[in-house]
């Protein structure tokens, strides 16, 4: 038993808990897209765990180099095509580097991580725009992921009737048929 205790103490010395993570974060920052957010290139996955870590280090150090990438990512996620501006929630990823063209799969896992990061961010940035996206995403999960027994489903498939994104794509005539939207866009 003494050997086991010594072995566990040695493991703790080498664990992530006893290491300085800032050099690792510095390396990670070099891979981030300073203009579009997220990692450079495409496809674009939000990688929430990295951004939660950056937010943690911002709260610990008050160094904006950790907050700025989080702010950029959240702005991109909330304003671009990865976010469903009609029903709320985010898609799994985008196929382009601009966060515009979503892969239409929506996963509970991604949306709960989005909620967690966004709720922590809203404690720092009080802008109602982000709070609205947070609330809309929570409502989306309650409406679309809860079944009649109040159990959560895990994902929405990207395909509808065998076509990726079919559920989300409208043609011109379908848009005209939506109540009052024609007046908004001055469509005749």
Predicted regions and their residues:
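Replace the tail clause
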Residues: 1-188
């Amino acid at each position: 038993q003494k050997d086991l205790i010594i072995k566990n103490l040695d493991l703790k010395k080498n664990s992530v808990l006893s290491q300085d993570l800032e050099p690792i974060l510095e390396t990670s920052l070099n891979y981030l897209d300073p203009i579009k957010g997220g990692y450079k290139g495409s496809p674009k996955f939000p990688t929430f765990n990295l951004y939660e870590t950056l937010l943690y280090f911002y709260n610990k150090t008050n160094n904006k180099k950790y907050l700025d990438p989080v702010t950029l990512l959240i702005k991109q996620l909330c304003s671009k095509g990865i976010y469903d501006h009609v029903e709320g929630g985010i898609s799994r990823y985008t196929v382009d580097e601009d966060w515009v063209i979503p892969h239409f799969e929506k996963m509970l896992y991604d949306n709960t991580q989005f909620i967690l990061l966004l709720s922590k961010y809203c404690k720092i940035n009080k802008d109602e725009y982000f709070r609205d996206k947070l609330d809309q995403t929570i409502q989306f999960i309650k409406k679309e992921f809860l079944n009649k027994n109040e159990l959560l489903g895990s994902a929405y498939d990207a395909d509808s009737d065998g076509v990726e994104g079919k559920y989300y794509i409208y043609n011109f005539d379908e848009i005209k048929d939506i109540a009052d939207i024609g007046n908004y866009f001055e469509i005749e």
